[in-house]
Amino acid sequence: MKKKLLSILLVLSLMLALVPAAFAAEPASGTCGAEGDGSNVTWTIDAAGTLTFTGTGAMRDYTAQSGTPWGRSGNAIQAVVVQEGITHIGAYAFFYYTNCRSVSLPSSLVSIGESAFAMNYGLTQLDLPEGLRKLGDMAFMSCRALERLTVPSTLEKIGKNTFSSCGSLSNVTLSEGLTVLGRLMFSGDRQLKNITLPQSLTTIGASAFQQTGLQELHIPASVTKIEGRAFEGTALTSVEVPGTVKTLLDSAFSSCDNLRSFTLGEGFRSVPNGLLSRCRSLERVTLPQSLEKIDDYAFSECPRLTEINIPDSVTTFGIRCFSRTGLRELTLPEGTTTIGGRAFADMPDLRELHIPAAVTSFGIGVFAGDSSLTTASLPSSLTEIPESTFAFCEKLTSVAIPDSVTSIGKEAFKNCKSLTAIDLPDAVTFIDASAFLDCQSLTQLQLPSALEALGDQAFGGCIGLTSLTVPDGVRKLPSWVFSSCQSLASLTLPTDLTSIGMGAFHGCRSLTEITIPDSVQSIGEMAFANMARLQAIHVGADNSAYQTVDGVLLTKAGDVLLAYPAARPGIRYDVPDGVTRIGERAFYGSGLMIVRFPQSLRTVADEAFKNSTRLIALDFPAGTEEIGTRAFNRDSNISDVFFGGTEDAWYQLVKDEAYKFPLDVQVHYQTSMVVPRAADLFTDVDADSWSYPGIDFCVLAGLMSGVGGDTFLPRGVTTRAQVVQILYNLSGEPAVAGGTPFTDLTADWYQDAIAWAYQTGVVSGTSATTFEPEAPVTREQIAVILMGYAEQVLSMDLSADKADLTAFPDGASVSDWARDAVAEAVALGLISGAQTKDGTFLQPQGGATREQAATILMGFYTLVDVEMRILEYDAQ
């Protein structure tokens, strides 16, 4: 055991012999002069860790990479003593000496090099000697324990960041005679809360006090120049800049969150760029009468600035100069000539602003985002409403546009949701993209006769617009130009129109028909998609590019089907022979349940049947080559697909997108679909009559049947019980528990249906004890029953729109209990009135014939969300 212990001690002693004692591997002295062989300055380190320099003249400069001869001993150095005679301390001489506690500098010292004492974390105080003329960049940067500093009056050249990021520095004495404070000199010194600027000071460098804790400031009359961001982000609460300052640069006092008042002395001709931007507590500003210009971003993002007096001498307002301020009122001098882009944008409290007539230069987005602005006037000299001028002014109700204006810029009135009407001058020839996008309250609009061109989405989303005439000078309708104009019910297109862009009328849900001029040679895809009430598209016979077949838009050659009107009567459609391609969104939102494609079909484009959720059966030919992405809704009711080709060929069609159809769809291979037609079942049903689509729908859906044999009796009476029975069938004939108070229900076939309708609140009877099941249902009664079914059974609110019944000569004769339901049914297009030589009459108490009831039921079906199956279709 003793031998083992001895061996361990021997090994340890050998290892310790290899480890040098403190400074043993470092020279304890040496030369570091900048002159000749360097012997003009010598250095020594004593056992206490004091590094002493002696000699005359300049010390050598070093770099962070090269290091100093004493560098490896840096962490052991406790003090630095530079003796008299030495004139220059070299760059990086004491860089990152974390334990140095004191520095003694001689009166002979003239300059201190770059980063000489940077990151000396132990240094707490520093007295720079009089006679020092130059401080290099970052000389004392990040001396984070430094608390007290004296700056001599003799400094002439001060580098950047000399005392920046000294987080503990709180006591600074600037000697009289000092003329310049360097760039970023005290930047980031958050404990520096007070400082007295000497009367000799002339220049405050860029960012000199940036992000310091300064709370008070007195600028001496001697100061003539304050450079950019000099006091940015300080804790100042009040500032007065005297007129003796001749140069005040950008953002000098920006981001001072505690600054409440600011005075700019007489003599200043401009408020510099960003001078007070983001001063979030600023409330009071005093400007000089000598002022001529308020520059870019001068007061931007000062939300508490609610009022300001602008001198009459001001002629120019820069970009975003007052954006995002809290100003409620603003009076611009009559001599104003220039207003920069977004000068008054995003001011949530500004309600009104008058632009003087002298303005000749008007930037983009001047009022954009002023959410409280209700009215504004524009200068008579204006020839263009620039881009985004009033964009997102959600409370703007009126604007007077001068007659001199010839063009409306991009997004000029975008999202002005309260704008109800606007008078466009006769001279306007161009309205750019999205100029009136989402102006939801705009109900009246007369486009100028001189208009020649429109931009994409120029009037998209104007959901209140009801009628529109496009002037003859317009040759092209660009993409989405009137998209989502949901109330647009009347449209006149110019006779010389040559093209209709993609989605031009997409979402115009109130248009029932559209006539395409013979001159049109180009129609973009989706031009007429998502038009819920569109029943027919018309094209003249002389059009060389397009044709319509039974209201459906096709190319002149008949090879591409471009648009199927979503509200075209009928639930089935046989695509015409010769069609090879179904265009993108061609059947958007259609109420079709059955579609059969011709043998010529090759391609169904992307989203061709988007939102055609009522589809239940499709018939494809064997030659089909492509079915586009999301051509059919995955969540549709499609239950059967008939395909003329093989199972392998079908797999090749759908393999790239496994869920083009519902997962439970049944595919019938090498066969086609046969669907019975009402005209083939009943001898008194005419396939060309106005009521045929409704009859065909109700028969195929099992909602109505014949009255015996091959007779349907279209003009026969529809009873109250029959209507209730149809809705009961539509609901899947749910189980009924309980009865009714009605004593006149004598037949068995309608007992459950009427009990169900009574218990669900769909009907209430003609009295407390009678229902009159065999009485003919009147037009107003069927309206009440259908609206009740939508609300009580389907939980759907169809009451958003109500028609004005006074438009009908007999509108006043509608019973009070039925008035709302009839107004809703008319607005929804379920009841349209009967045309006579004396006008269009509602005939509310008139009986609804079977063909009328069938048509109303089909229209109702297109509006409600209810699953339905066709009664019968067979494979052939």
Question: What are these regions, as identified by a protein language model?
Answer:
Residues 16-28:
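Sec-dependent signal peptide cleavage junction
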Residues 242, 674-692, 700, 705-752, ...:
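Feature responds to low-complexity, polar/acidic, surface-exposed segments characteristic
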Residues 25-99, 116-118, 586-588, 651-662, ...:
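Surface-exposed repetitive/solenoidal architectures
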Residues 9-17:
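Bacterial N-terminal signal peptides
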Residues 50-56, 75-88, 98-111, 121-134, ...:
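Structural signature of tandem-repeat unit edges
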Residues 90-93, 113-116, 137-139, 159-162, ...:
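Consensus positions within tandem repeat domains that build extended binding/scaffold surfaces
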Residues 1-10:
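Positively charged n-region of N-terminal signal peptides that target proteins for export
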